[in-house]
Amino acid sequence: MAAAAAAAVAGVGRGGGGAEPRQERSRARGWAGVERSEGRRMEPGEELEEEGSPGGREDGFTAEHLAAEAMAADMDPWLVFDARTTPATELDAWLAKYPPSQVTRYGDPGSPNSEPVGWIAVYGQGYSPNSGDVQGLQAAWEALQTSGRPITPGTLRQLAITHHVLSGKWLMHLAPGFKLDHAWAGIARAVVEGQLQVAKVSPRAKEGGRQVICVYTDDFTDRLGVLEADSAIRAAGIKCLLTYKPDVYTYLGIYRANRWHLCPTLYESRFQLGGSARGSRVLDRANNVELT
């Protein structure tokens, strides 16, 4: 079950190749080093998106700008803790060495990294990249755009199912500081302990702003699995707003400020203090229906 979600946290490195445009090789240097991920490319633009209403320009950024900004991050090395090859007892030392509020995007003086870092990620023991037919998905998307047929959430869902591109992720945005580092540590431990599968966090940008933590699931059409991941995130101590986005939107370059006025997030989760054993209320954004 972890394969698709694991593929969603695979980054691209310099010179990476393969028939699939988002596939690349690994160049790990141990848990404390820099690693280029296996499988498909990581999400472009996640640290900049998901906060506003769909459509148009927002904060001066178009969907194309968001994609281009983070594509550069995808090309840089990542800091990775790989539970498949590294003892869980080493996680705390790794977290202490690379707190996301201190790791900088371009390796600023005084930061733990001297070189650029695209993402910080934790792979669970079930990590096994499998992104589906991304090339076929993108070709079908190009054909759809030139066909004149309507582009709706339903058509994108069907494209994803047809090409087996089913992974998705819960996103949470936090300002740099203790709360971010504490939240990331909780998520990382949940991944290593098996409650969650794969996760990543963006490094601190030079211009500041919130950083994003992404927690992946195998299948965005599996509502129960998506809700179980939400519960595990809440159990890890996360209380901020969460939004859930299928990876098909990212592969096709569809962000919040897109020309089709599509909302790329399916679900919204808000922490609920008391009254609910699961600790959150989850809203189906497309249908405006509470699921929990």
Swiss-Prot record:
InterPro entries: Bles03, TIF_eIF4e-like
Low complexity bias: start-end ranges: 1-11
Biased composition (Basic and acidic residues): 35-44
Record region (Disordered): 1-60
Record's keyword terms, sorted: Methylation
Superkingdom, natural source: Eukaryota
Molecular function per GO: RNA binding
Modified residues (Omega-N-methylarginine): R29
Protein family (similarity comment): Belongs to the UPF0696 family.
Protein name per Swiss-Prot or TrEMBL: UPF0696 protein C11orf68
Organism the protein comes from: Homo sapiens
